[in-house]
Amino acid sequence: MQRSVHELLTPRTIDVKESSATRAKVTLEPLERGFGHTLGSALRRILLSSMPGCAVTEAQIDGVLHEYSAIEGVQEDVIEILLNLKGVAVKMNGRDDAELTLSKKGPGVVTAGDIKLDHDVEIANPEHVICHLSENGEVNMRLRVARGRGYEPADQRGLDEDETRAIGRLQLDATFSPVRRVAYAVESARVEQRTDLDKLVIDLETNGTIDPEEAIRRAATILQQQLAVFVDFDHEKEPERVEEEEEIDPILLRPVDDLELTVRSANCLKAENIYYIGDLIQRTEVELLKTPNLGKKSLTEIKDVLASRGLSLGMRLDNWPPASLRGDDRVLGG
């Protein structure tokens, strides 16, 4: 293999071995020495802390005012029920929140599969146990599901709603990340005569709302988006605001020669860097009278010519000079 000593290897092989619908090992090779840990650590952090997903964030249980309660006929206390609700793997399609209900009478086991779902909401682990009911036990609850990212403690959510939140609306710490566990290992790899290369092996498990391969793909996309700014530092700059200029009356863009003034008056104006009609109308009578060789007779001539075109001296143009004339040094007084 002919390769410049300055050229870094890029991975050529990616292998995905799924041991189940929720667990897989992803192998990436070859990598330059050290890149296995660099990429493995970054992807692991993103997979655990930054992946978007859905979770139960609030529960209302009939007859329960706070989490330190107990429900007659239910084996678990409310705190245990809330902990079990955190383990429900929810997936929403095309929406950011949902209100779900769960009602069941005993005896029996209450599972995630007993939750009544909307058409665009799925439960990936319907067998997940929520609580156990005795013969006379009954449970009725309303659950709020929301979309988020990573982990969100209940005390950091909706602080502005605390005063209006009804008693009995129990808040849950939410683990939105669909990734349950991630581990990575770096092994030795070989390419022809080189034996100092890395092979990255990522072992991950999800909650079933996303397959492991897609989880890796999303994590890599997040990492790519975060690093993109370093590829082109122009991305750091805020887009320049292009201010829309008001339409300029075309007559103002015409040279003063078009006014057909006397040679004396025209030469006096050019001596003061007044080349366009737009320049002229912004001057006052006092300013023009200070122009060498321009007397009251010439001033009257200029005023009359401008008046015949519906213009006058002392007018104000906020957007002058326009972009079309900014390259003309004469307009800038050059």
Swiss-Prot record:
One of its GO terms (molecular function) is DNA-directed RNA polymerase activity. It comes from the Bacteria. It is an enzyme of class 2 (transferase). Residues 1-234 are annotated as: Alpha N-terminal domain (alpha-NTD). GO terms for biological process: DNA-templated transcription. Pfam families: RNA_pol_A_bac, RNA_pol_A_CTD, RNA_pol_L. Coiled coil: none annotated. It catalyses: RNA(n) + a ribonucleoside 5'-triphosphate = RNA(n+1) + diphosphate. Residues 248-334 are annotated as: Alpha C-terminal domain (alpha-CTD). Its EC number is 2.7.7.6. Homodimer. The RNAP catalytic core consists of 2 alpha, 1 beta, 1 beta' and 1 omega subunit. When a sigma factor is associated with the core the holoenzyme is formed, which can initiate transcription. Belongs to the RNA polymerase alpha chain family. DNA-dependent RNA polymerase catalyzes the transcription of DNA into RNA using the four ribonucleoside triphosphates as substrates. The N-terminal domain is essential for RNAP assembly and basal transcription, whereas the C-terminal domain is involved in interaction with transcriptional regulators and with upstream promoter elements. This is DNA-directed RNA polymerase subunit alpha. The gene is rpoA.
